[in-house]
């Protein structure tokens, strides 16, 4: 089956549209997150999203609508912890991640059990993408992209030098909060496609790959975006061809590209 035939299926078209947009958003946000050493926040939020979706399924409400405010609140709290010198941010993120997973597992075990819907949210499924999911993903992803572009220069400033940014009158906390909220939205939107357990890889891997190939912030951002979208399309194609889980296949593609970039970096130094 060729690629054109593969994407003639409606569920693959929905997966491609939503996946490309989520991958693009995740890569753009991943660069400042990794540079600011906030990358573990993305991983923590992915576990929070699992706990939220478990509660949503148990209550019989729409998981996405329930998860968005919960994960945004968690992002706000994690950001405050990360900026507070009295707290160990890594420990706080680990505690929230473990607690969210535990809550999710307990809720599932006492209510619906491991249903197909829960499994899809945990590990991702192209078949799980409905038209409503795609429309919501498109609208919110476009909002994330527009906000990132509008505040690009300010995000650049707070990423590299918060002290100087404060001295120039920039509201650093405001833009850090914006970054956390946009990340939370992206994590929730990617849950259906990639799975809550793997969505954070879309935030981390493209940024790490780009940072080994480019030195300028703009170069890293562009490279991360291109890499993320390309790896998603490659992973989606391989997943369909070999009947493998979408999330895991996309992560494997990201990992392969990252290892290749590391090899290129070593050859450059040599």
Describe the predicted segments one by one.
Residues 130-206:
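Helix-loop-helix "hairpin" substructures at the membrane interface of multi-pass membrane proteins
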Residues 15-18, 63-71, 90-94, 138, ...:
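Loop-to-transmembrane alpha-helix initiation sites
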Residues 11-18, 118-145:
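Loop-to-helix entry region at the N-terminal start of transmembrane alpha-helices
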Residues 1-24:
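Membrane-interfacial amphipathic/re-entrant helices at transmembrane-helix boundaries
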Residues 193, 197-248:
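Transmembrane alpha-helical segments in multi-pass inner-membrane proteins
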Residues 31-114, 210-222, 239-242, 265-267:
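Short loop segments and helix-boundary regions at transmembrane helix junctions
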Residues 1-9, 113-129, 237-240:
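Membrane-interface helix termini and inter-helical loops of multi-pass transporters
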Residues 48-58, 96-107, 128, 172-183, ...:
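Small-residue-rich segments of transmembrane alpha-helices in multi-pass membrane proteins
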